[in-house]
Amino acid sequence: MEFELSRLQPKERASFALRALYEDAGCRKYHMGRFEEYGLYQENRSFLSSEQVITFTDLDGRLLALKPDVTLSIAKTAQPAKGETLRYYYHENVYRPSAESHTFKEISQMGLEMLGTVGEAEVQQAVCLAAKSLGLLGSAWVLEISHMGYLFGLLDALNVPAEMRPVLLEKLRAKNAHEFRTAAEAAGLDRSEADVLVELLSLNGSYADVLPKAEAFCRNERMRNAAEELRALAEPLEAAGGSIRLDLTLAGEMEYYNGLIFQGYLKSLPRPLLKGGRYDLLIRKFTPGAGAIGFAVYLDELDRLSAPLPPVQKQQTEKVMLNVALPKGRLGDKVYNLLAKIGYGCPEDYNATRKLVVENPEAGIRYFLVKPSDVAIYVEHGAADVGIVGKDILTEA
């Protein structure tokens, strides 16, 4: 009997394609067990996406954990020699809490790590492999790139206190200019300094357009060094195809990333499929003087590509419809009225008809009226492309 690749699920086909890509690039497969001693995660909590870990006591009395992270285990055991660069790829399951379901999820990951001597060539290879990974997974993709050194350099130039930096990075990630400015002023910046910081929000767009602006915006040597590293990536990335964007509002966790960071998207998927960056701070806890860069591909996200559409989305229209999950109540009404004023209203009044789905095919928009707590679930499962929620729901999440 012949084996047909078409019978495989998208994530199964992806794993074969990515394995070939990484092995051709000189990476060796890294094998690890399902369990890790809990002490590793307890001692390195700041490097984890969540402090919640599934633990159990082994028969010999040791406290073990179902691994929530692969990179941490590789960083602990790799131990590259001076002058050596280790290249690994992995295909593992990790166990993390889901903000949407408030339960633990088993997540299938493939990833790539380069550890040891990590210079310009290794950085370029890792980022280009991230772009090629996206190219193998879909025809329409976007890779967004930023640099934590650039952001730290600007915070240094403005003398932002260390204890206020995590708050500012959180507001920067939210891309909310008003709250970003408020946080900047709370950190002790005057109006002109806050204006400089808020200008970061404009450094977002195509790589070729934004890079010269980022170079001109530099305030110190640390920012210039980061801009030079971004400039060195321009030519290799140009040959990668796809859409490459420079987004200096993209900020990783400051305890984890210290250089380039990047994340990748595929058309029709609501959140990043690929995330990565440079994490020298982590590898140096185990191997002093070493560097590291890598990324993970979240294969489970590819299941959405083969999932059946909700019945309302199967209706054929000439235009591609934007599906919006609106919370029932005042917030939903307010957002709907704002959108209606600029041409995105619907012929029928959902409050009058009590319908939970209304649409305007001419404007290419469809609204789902849902409980505020269900908005994230609609987006999570791909029924809606975007959702509107208030601060109370965000706080709960």
Language model regions located:
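Domain-level signature for soluble enzymes in the chorismate/prephenate branch of the shikimate pathway
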Residues: 130, 317-397
